[in-house]
Amino acid sequence: LPAAGKAEAAKLAVVPLANHVEDNTTASMIYMEEIMDTFKFPEFDMIAEDVVDKAVGSRNISDFSKANLERIARESGADIVIAMSLDKLDDKALFPRREPTLKLDMSGEFAFLNKVTGRYYVKKYSDDMEIEEILTVRSDWKSEEFAKTVRSYLKKVTQFK
């Protein structure tokens, strides 16, 4: 954003992840880590959490409409607002299979508003995938897949289409 011949950092309001998955304590941390990796200073200046919380009005956003994101942007002073929910992140064994197999079901919603470019994007996401169980022994497969989903949607925020 130009101001007196200088480019200023875009002010970024990150709405806390609305995590509706019981017994999942890592999703919010993954969400914030991916945001911190994607939106770095000096290009982006993250607005303080207490300011965003006050603008959102509650910890779990349920309204991803353009009007609501515009309100959050106005009340927080943000140029860009990012919001996401995780409604389902569940894996289960599939039987009978030749090799033990797991199926992952993941769903939620992602939205952003960029006042600089005028872009608004909202998408309900739903994904299911299968993997041989042996490949998940030394990893947190569910968390890794959620992180990939977060990264793919955060890329949309920085695109200018």
Q: What are these model-predicted stretches?
A:
Residues L1-A13, M29, I72-E75, D91, ...:
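C-terminal/domain-edge helix-coil "capping" segments
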Residues D23-N24, D91-R97:
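Extracytoplasmic/secreted cell-surface and envelope-processing proteins
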Residues N19-V21, D53-K54, L89-D91, E132-I134:
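A short, flexible beta-alpha/helix-coil linker loop
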